[in-house]
Design a protein with these regions (language model features):
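Surface-exposed, interaction-prone regions used to assemble/regulate multi-protein complexes
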Residues: 1-94
Length: 94
């Protein structure tokens, strides 16, 4: 059974990709900062479109193969596929 989900961040202002780990630096409102980390990333499509005015990111769970998430902004869409769940961490420096 597939499970859809959706959650919001105002915008992704930066990201890092080290090996199989993708970390998104997000700003919600004026003062709230979040890091959203994805581990064991299999595929990342549209990497150039991650930073920008992201209005939401959403996706679905594939039993046995993991998660596919889509990041939508005003011009193009990026997506990431990972077999593991992600982690949201409040705050970041900078």
């Amino acid at each position: 059974m597939y499970r859809d989900f959706q959650f919001y961040d105002s915008r992704i202002v930066d990201y890092t990709r080290i090996g199989e780990t993708l970390t998104l630096f997000c700003v919600y409102g004026i003062h709230e900062k979040w890091r959203t980390c994805f581990y064991r990333v299999k595929y990342l499509v549209g990497e150039d479109f991650l930073v920008g005015s992201v209005i939401s990111f959403f996706g679905y769970e594939n039993p046995g193969s993991g998660y596919t998430l889509f990041f939508r902004n005003s011009s193009r869409t990026a997506s990431v596929v990972t077999p593991e769940h992600w982690r949201r961490i409040q705050g970041w420096e900078g």
